[in-house]
C-alpha cells in the first residue's frame, strides 16, 4: 500500500455494526425471518462501499476465524508477519440497529371461474431505528429512522405458493443503502468541494444514493452552537443559502446546478442536506 493510501486508511472513521435487535412488536415468524436474513451483511456492504468509513467486523463467526489464524500464527509454522494478538482496531462508533416493524408475505385471491388459479402479489417492508453510539463517551452521536419496501406486480399462479425471496432481498438492500447514506450524512455531511458559477461539486459519488434530478438544500455553515449548561456542541448555526439539483453523478464526486440562491455567495465548505419530507 502506498503512503497516501495508508494515510487515507488510517484517517477513516472506524465503525462496527452491532448485532441486530428486533422489537417485541414483530411477530415470532417475521422475527425469525429477519434475523436469518442478509440484513446485517447488506448494511456492512453498503457502509463499506460508501468508502467513508473503515468497517470493523464484530460478527462472531468472523472473529472466530480471525482468532483461529492468530493461534496458527503462534504455532511456529508461519512467518509471523501478520495475525498478531492484541492488535485489532477499536470502533470509534457502534451502529445499533433495531427493527421496529417487518413484514414479508404474499397476498392471494382466487381467479373467478378458473379452478386452482390465484392472483398473487408479494411484498416486503421494514422500518428500523438507528443509533450511532460513541464508544469512548457512551453518547448517542446521532439517531435516525430508516424505512424501505418492495413489492411485485400481480400475477396469476397455479396455487398460492410462497413469496419471492427476491422481493425481500430488494427491500433489505434498499434499507441498507438508506442507512449507509444517512450514516454518512450524519458523520460527514455532503460538502461543497468546488463551486464555479451555478455548478457545485460535492464529496459524494455514484455509491452515495444521490440521483440525477434529486434536489438538495444548500446551507452556509456558521459558528458552533454550544449549550451553556452542558458545554455540549449542538451543531452549527446553518443558514439556508439556496437549492441545487443533481445534474451528474460521477464515481467519486457529484455535480449539482444551483436553481435558487446567489452563485457568488456559495463556495467550498457549504453543506447540502436533503429536504425534510
Task: For the regions a language model picked out, list residue spans one by one.
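C-terminal/domain-edge helix-coil "capping" segments
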Residues: 2-13, 123, 133-201, 208-212, ...
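Soluble non-cytosolic domains of exported or imported proteins
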Residues: 29-41, 76, 80, 120-123, ...
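Short, compositionally biased
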Residues: 227-252
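Short coil-to-beta-strand transition motifs
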Residues: 93, 184-187, 235-242
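Amphipathic beta-strand/beta-sheet edge segments enriched in Tyr/Trp
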Residues: 93-152
